[in-house]
Structure formats: structure tokens, C-alpha cells
């Protein structure tokens, strides 16, 4: 079960992945998370993002933005970079990922996912058999951390158990 939380690959940034090699390996569709993967949370598309999506199209990739955000946020970003989109995707549920592949006319073996969150982005993509890249969040302060901590019983707990 835990293997579903491990990304296939990790990258410092979505912008630093070798997409040319991935295209040569047969990948044809890329699903991206937006916030903290491509831009800071809530930020509009940057010139860097717009140029980046243009280069991906030149390589031959289909691109799609998959977000749990509402349509105005996702549509405005998608329009700016020239990508397809699915809003209120319900990540980590499978439906959004499956719809994304359907829209791009790709299968799990020709699609990859790029995102910054283990418990939504990576888990959802892995449940669909999609190769995953986990990126470092653009703004680590905004990253949602889920930590499993071991805490020893407090002295009070020890007294009550006697």
C-alpha cells in the first residue's frame, strides 16, 4: 500500500525535467498540478510558464492542468498557457486522472503526472498507473505537511495506567 505514496521520480522543479527524453521514451501526455508546482499558490501564469508550455507543444506533448481548484482559477491559467484543464478534479480520486487521459487520448503507459503533493497528486496518479514526478514546492511555507509522529506517553498517562 505505501508504494502508492512513493513518486517514480523527484525533481527540484517542473521546469527542470528532461521532457525531450520522456517524449523519446514514448510519453505523449503530461498532467500538471498548478499551485506550488508551476507557480506560487494562487499566482497567475508567468511568462516562464507560458514559454514552457509552448516548448512542450513543440515537442509534441498534450498537456492538461488537473486541479481541485474552482473553474475561474484553473481556466484563466489554462487559457494563458494553452493547456486543457479539469477543475474540481477530486484528487486523489481516480476520476480526474482518467478523464485527463481520455481528453488527451493517452493511456497510463504514455502519460506522466507532475505535482508537488504526495497525498493528492502522486497518490491519485499512482492509483491510475501513471508515472509520477514529485517536485519541490515553489513556496515550501505553503506546503501541506502530513507527519506521522511517535509520542511517548506523558507521565500523567503512565500514572493512569497503573
Label every PLM stretch briefly.
Residues 88-94, 137-140:
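Short, acidic/turn-prone active-site loops that include or flank metal/cofactor-
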Amino acid at each position: 500500500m505505501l508504494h502508492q505514496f512513493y513518486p517514480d521520480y523527484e525533481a527540484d522543479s517542473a521546469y527542470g525535467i528532461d521532457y525531450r527524453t520522456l517524449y523519446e521514451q514514448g510519453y505523449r501526455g503530461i498532467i500538471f498540478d498548478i499551485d506550488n508546482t508551476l507557480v506560487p499558490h494562487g499566482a497567475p501564469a508567468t511568462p516562464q510558464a507560458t514559454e514552457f508550455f509552448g516548448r512542450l507543444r513543440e515537442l509534441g506533448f498534450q498537456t492538461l492542468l488537473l486541479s481541485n481548484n474552482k473553474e475561474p482559477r484553473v481556466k484563466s491559467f489554462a487559457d494563458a498557457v494553452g493547456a486543457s484543464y479539469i477543475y474540481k478534479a477530486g484528487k486523489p480520486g481516480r476520476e480526474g486522472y482518467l478523464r485527463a487521459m481520455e481528453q488527451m487520448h493517452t493511456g497510463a503507459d504514455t502519460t506522466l503526472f507532475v505535482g508537488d503533493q504526495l497525498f493528492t497528486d502522486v497518490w491519485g496518479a499512482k492509483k491510475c498507473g501513471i508515472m509520477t514526478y514529485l517536485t519541490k514546492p515553489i513556496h515550501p511555507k505553503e506546503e501541506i505537511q502530513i507527519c506521522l509522529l511517535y509520542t511517548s506517553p506523558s507521565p500523567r498517562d503512565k500514572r493512569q495506567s497503573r
